[in-house]
Structure formats: structure tokens, C-alpha cells
Amino acid sequence: MQANPQLLLQLVEIQMPYGRFKGRILCDLPVSYLEWFSRKGFPKDKLGILLQTLYEIKMNGLENLLEPLKKNKGY
């Protein structure tokens, strides 16, 4: 399975639209918040797909996939 580049790019562009971390770029969400979603259920929309993807990336130690994208965005 190959990573979807568009999905990865959205992880460094889109802000969390609600909740405790509203306004934070998705890739900067803490693992504990993603674990909470994993237990309670991810949203059933595009945001849910992004959060679930980010959860898998962080749980598998693959954050380095996002580093070049973050640098291109100036973070």
C-alpha cells in the first residue's frame, strides 16, 4: 500500500476545525488526542480519514514522512 501524497499534504495544511485543539494543524495534534478518537470513534467524514491516517502514521513512528511537507510549508 502506497501513501497518498494528497492526503499527506492535507495533514500539514488543514487545521482542526473544532474541539480542544481547534485551529491546530492536524500533523501537530498530540498522540493522546488521536488515541482518544481511536477509542471513541473517528468522525465519519474526510476529517475522520485524515485523523485516522495521522493516528497510524504516529503510532508506527512514520512522522518523518511529513517532515519534508512541513518544511515546504515553512514549519
Report each predicted region and the residues it spans.
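DEDD superfamily 3′-5′ metal-dependent exonuclease/proofreading module
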Residues: 1-75
